């Protein structure tokens, strides 16, 4: 079973744009959640990261990538999705 990829974002963020572009070019399906638009989404992101990260955050299965860390994102996607 393929794991969900969730992207917690803030609007108008260059890192968010970079992550979206990367995931789309890699053919990865992902869900987008705006932490500014919904308090429950913000709370869910904080719980997933244990408060250690601010948006954008990528959640892949139970793995978290904070910000646009291309190398970590590639490694995590390879491990979790393949």
Description of each model-found segment:
Residues 56-65:
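A short, hydrophobic beta-strand/beta-hairpin element that forms part of a small beta-sheet core
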Residues 74-82:
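Thiol-/selenol-based redox modules, centered on thioredoxin-like
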Residues 17, 43, 74-75:
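Alpha-helical elements of the RecA-like P-loop NTPase motor core of helicases
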Residues 34-51:
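Thioredoxin-like thiol-disulfide oxidoreductase module
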């Amino acid at each position: 079973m393929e794991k969900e990829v969730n992207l917690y974002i803030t609007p108008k963020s260059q890192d968010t744009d970079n992550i979206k572009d990367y995931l789309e070019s890699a053919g990865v399906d992902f869900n987008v959640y705006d932490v500014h638009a919904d308090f429950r989404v913000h709370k869910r992101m904080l719980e997933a990261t244990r408060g250690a990260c601010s948006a954008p955050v990528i959640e892949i299965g139970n793995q978290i990538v904070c910000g646009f860390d291309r190398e970590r994102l590639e490694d995590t996607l390879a491990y979790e999705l393949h």
